[in-house]
């Protein structure tokens, strides 16, 4: 029988050290609010319900924590009286009865489903409390996990630790799992007889043991448990996330020439044998099929590249850009809300927006689709195997038929039939010797200005 699980995610802090107009859990890591990463991790661990403890920016935090298919309920913590008090803000959710309760933090976005799974497994195996800890060579400031004969006997805060206990390098992350059937009994026994008068969640370890119940500690990588309190730590977490995701992609068959210069989003999907050159940035919503190439200094967001497509260098793909197989968008091009058909080429210095470019078509340098009249967007449709000459302007709405030719420098405002050749420019005139007269006149004007000044 599958075990039921509730995750209580604490996200009610004032975020003072972040020095921000919004809660720190709303700050993005890889293009997604921190809280969103935590919710995804608990969902991946099989959690069926989330109790989100909120304070500042409650509505925005709750919105950022929503995840399709997962029940997320927000509980307002009106007063800040410690972590134990924060968890009990979700009392109504806890008392519904779950096999296990996970306590996580909205500002620890690198936590993985695998680690949370292990905590749940420990509860399923008979422990009443499973605390997630980490080993570090810099334990100063952290609570220490005191273990005897494989059992966690206490979490000792540094200020209360003996000299011998301070030598312990296994530290408390704050995350834990609790037997859901006993959770309220344990939590309600937490007292506030301390200098700050607060209710500390860490007390559940000694409370459980005093009742003859088991508490254990499980280990996780220190980096995974990194918390965020200020902008410097946010940048560090971003770096750790990027390093981890790049490594995962490269192990899965993606080539990156200089991975440290590639920046991914939380939902970037890249297939095998894709080559990513240096200094590429992926915004949210990008999918790249096998065998595609993204050249250096390109920026992609909300785009899809089919097998064998080529982008860049110095290209920008905006939301709705869809490159079919073997299509190419080259240097200094921008594509937005446009289909680029199979084998079509948009090689350089071009803007294609709100458009359809048929298979095999060639878009010359400097050609643009004029899609906006100041009020409305309109579509440009270019048929298969058409040729759009350099420096042409296609004024939407307009349709270019299959195999049509547009002469260079044209301004096209009317539809062009298939197989037609269209010109939309003034006829060239040549006036022999006129350049000499123009130069003499300009020179005389310049001399006259000098004399008058």
Curated annotation (Swiss-Prot):
Binding site for UDP-N-acetyl-alpha-D-glucosamine: 10-13, 24, 77, 82-83, 105-107, 143, 157, 172, 229, 318, 336, 351, 362
Its EC number(s): 2.7.7.23, 2.3.1.157
Pathway membership: Nucleotide-sugar biosynthesis; UDP-N-acetyl-alpha-D-glucosamine biosynthesis; N-acetyl-alpha-D-glucosamine 1-phosphate from alpha-D-glucosamine 6-phosphate (route II): step 2/2; Nucleotide-sugar biosynthesis; UDP-N-acetyl-alpha-D-glucosamine biosynthesis; UDP-N-acetyl-alpha-D-glucosamine from N-acetyl-alpha-D-glucosamine 1-phosphate: step 1/1; Bacterial outer membrane biogenesis; LPS lipid A biosynthesis
Stretch list, region Pyrophosphorylase: 1-231
Entry superkingdom: Bacteria
Location within or outside the cell: Cytoplasm
InterPro entries linked to this entry: Bifunctional_GlmU (IPR005882), GlmU-like (IPR050065), GlmU_C_LbH (IPR038009), Hexapep (IPR001451), Hexapep_transf_CS (IPR018357), MobA-like_NTP_Trfase (IPR025877), Nucleotide-diphossugar_trans (IPR029044), Trimer_LpxA-like_sf (IPR011004)
A Pfam family: NTP_transf_3
Gene3D superfamilies named among the record's database cross-references: Hexapeptide repeat proteins, Spore Coat Polysaccharide Biosynthesis Protein SpsA, Chain A
GO biological process: cell morphogenesis; cell wall organization; lipid A biosynthetic process; peptidoglycan biosynthetic process; regulation of cell shape; UDP-N-acetylglucosamine biosynthetic process
Renumbered residue ranges of the record's region N-acetyltransferase: 253-453
Active-site residues, Swiss-Prot/TrEMBL: 348
Family: In the N-terminal section; belongs to the N-acetylglucosamine-1-phosphate uridyltransferase family.
Its biological purpose: Catalyzes the last two sequential reactions in the de novo biosynthetic pathway for UDP-N-acetylglucosamine (UDP-GlcNAc). The C-terminal domain catalyzes the transfer of acetyl group from acetyl coenzyme A to glucosamine-1-phosphate (GlcN-1-P) to produce N-acetylglucosamine-1-phosphate (GlcNAc-1-P), which is converted into UDP-GlcNAc by the transfer of uridine 5-monophosphate (from uridine 5-triphosphate), a reaction catalyzed by the N-terminal domain.
Alphabetized PANTHER family for the sequence: BIFUNCTIONAL PROTEIN GLMU (PTHR43584:SF3), NUCLEOTIDYL TRANSFERASE (PTHR43584)
Protein name (Swiss-Prot/TrEMBL): Bifunctional protein GlmU
Organism: Agrobacterium fabrum (strain C58 / ATCC 33970)
Species lineage: Bacteria, Pseudomonadati, Pseudomonadota, Alphaproteobacteria, Hyphomicrobiales
């Amino acid at each position: 029988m599958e075990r039921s699980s509730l995750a209580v995610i604490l996200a009610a802090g004032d975020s003072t050290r972040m020095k921000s107009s919004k809660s720190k859990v709303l700050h993005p890591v890889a293009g997604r609010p921190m809280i969103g990463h935590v919710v995804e991790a608990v969902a991946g661990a099989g959690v069926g319900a989330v109790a989100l403890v909120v304070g500042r920016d409650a509505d925005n935090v709750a919105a950022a924590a929503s995840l399709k298919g997962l029940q997320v309920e927000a509980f307002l913590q009106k007063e800040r009286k410690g972590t134990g008090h924060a968890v009990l803000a979700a009392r109504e959710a806890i008392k519904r009865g779950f096999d296990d309760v996970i306590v996580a933090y909205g500002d620890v976005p690198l936590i993985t489903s695998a680690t949370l799974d292990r905590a749940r497994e420990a509860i399923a195996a008979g422990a009443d409390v499973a605390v997630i800890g980490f080993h570090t060579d810099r334990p100063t400031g952290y609570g220490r996990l005191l273990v005897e004969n494989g059992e966690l006997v206490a979490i000792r805060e540094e200020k209360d630790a003996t000299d011998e206990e301070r030598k312990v390098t296994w530290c408390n992350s704050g995350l834990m799992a609790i037997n859901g059937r006993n959770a309220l009994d344990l939590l309600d026994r937490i007292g506030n007889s301390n200098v700050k008068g607060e209710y500390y969640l860490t007390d559940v370890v000694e409370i459980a043991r005093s009742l003859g119940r088991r508490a254990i500690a499980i280990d996780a990588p220190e980096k995974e448990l990194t918390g965020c309190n200020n902008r410097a730590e946010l940048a560090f977490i971003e770096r750790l996330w990027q390093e981890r995701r790049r490594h995962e992609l490269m192990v899965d068959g993606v080539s990156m020439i200089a991975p440290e210069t590639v920046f991914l989003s939380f939902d970037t999907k890249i297939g095998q044998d894709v080559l990513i050159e240096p200094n590429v940035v992926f915004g949210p919503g990008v999918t790249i099929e096998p065998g595609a190439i993204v050249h250096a200094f390109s920026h992609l967001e909300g785009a899809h590249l089919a097998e064998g497509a080529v982008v860049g260098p110095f290209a920008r793909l905006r939301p709705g850009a869809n490159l079919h197989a073997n299509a190419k968008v080259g240097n200094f091009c921008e594509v937005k809300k446009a289909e680029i058909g199979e084998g079509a080429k948009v090689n350089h210095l071009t803007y294609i927006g709100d458009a359809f470019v048929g298979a095999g078509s060639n878009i010359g340098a400097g050609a643009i689709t004029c899609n906006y009249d100041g009020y409305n967007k309109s579509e440009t449709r270019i048929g298969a195997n058409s040729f759009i000459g350099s420096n042409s302007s296609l004024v939407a709405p307009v349709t270019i038929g299959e195999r049509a030719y547009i002469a260079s420098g044209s301004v096209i405002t009317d539809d062009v039939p298939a197989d037609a050749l269209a010109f939309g420019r003034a006829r060239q005139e040549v006036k022999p010797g006129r350049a000499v007269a123009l130069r003499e006149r300009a020179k005389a004007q310049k001399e006259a200005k000098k004399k008058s000044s």
